[in-house]
Design a protein with these regions (language model features):
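Short loop/helix-cap segments at secondary-structure boundaries that form the rim of catalytic
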Residues: 86, 101-104, 178-182
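Residue-level recognition of beta-strand termini and adjacent short loop/turns
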Residues: 6-9, 22
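Conserved SAM-binding loop and adjacent beta-strand
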Residues: 71, 103, 123-124
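Glycine-rich beta-strand-centered segment in the early N-terminal region that forms part
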Residues: 19-35, 43-95
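Mid-domain Rossmann-like dinucleotide-binding core that forms the NAD(H)/NADP(H) cofactor-binding site
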Residues: 116-183
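Short N-terminal binding/cap micro-motifs at the start of the first secondary-structure element
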Residues: 9-14, 36-39
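A structural motif shared across PLP-dependent enzymes of the aminotransferase-like
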Residues: 92-105
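Short structural boundary motif marking the start of a folded domain
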Residues: 1-2, 26
Length: 183
């Protein structure tokens, strides 16, 4: 089954036929998928501006904005078919919310054995933080303010804290996040 956004604010579970895997593909059975609070909420509300439809397209998205669209990119599952070195391994993939799927083996990343699927599903959030730092890399001695102590902001602040001689301040207008921001 797959989750589809039928129209802004209205989703549905649809059946699907799992395609036959090709050479070099893997069949993954989903263990966990995550909904990003920012991007996917924007998509669910139908808030993606037409000028951003191409830029916001997810790697294995089906359909188009505002809907119907099968969207998502935080998926952790177990490889059930595919190259021997991947079979039985837990993997992360930028795939929508679906119970099973077929993708090229290169589209999955093996999750370390000591990382539970409930935590591994957050890998996409860390990827967003890494991309932000690639777009605006800090220099030694920089003083950086990260605005927003949500998932992405906390990941950015944590990564910045590992840079030598970079002073990081995490701030948020939400008073309930003050403890996280101060840490």
């Amino acid at each position: 089954q797959a989750f589809w956004l039928r129209s802004p604010g209205r989703g549905e579970i649809r059946p699907f036929a799992l395609p036959e895997p090709g050479r070099g593909d893997v069949v993954v059975r989903t263990l966990r998928s995550g909904v990003s609070r920012g991007t996917e909420t924007l998509v669910f509300r139908g808030g993606v501006p037409p000028s951003q439809h191409a830029a916001m397209r997810a790697p294995f998205q089906e359909g188009d904005f505002p809907g119907p669209v099968k969207y998502g990119y935080l998926n952790v599952g177990v490889v059930e078919q595919g190259p021997l070195e991947l079979r039985g391994h837990t993997v992360f993939c930028l795939y929508p919310h679906q119970t099973a799927y077929v993708v090229p083996a290169g589209a999955v990343n093996v999750v370390p054995d000591d990382v539970p699927p409930t935590r591994a599903v957050l890998a996409g959030t860390v990827e967003t933080a890494v991309n932000a730092l690639w777009d605006a890399p800090p220099l030694v001695g920089d003083r950086v303010a990260v605005v927003g102590a949500g998932m992405v902001g906390c990941c950015v602040a944590r990564l910045l804290a590992r840079f030598p001689a970079v002073e990081v301040t995490l701030v948020d207008v939400d008073a309930s996040r003050a403890g996280v921001a101060a840490a």
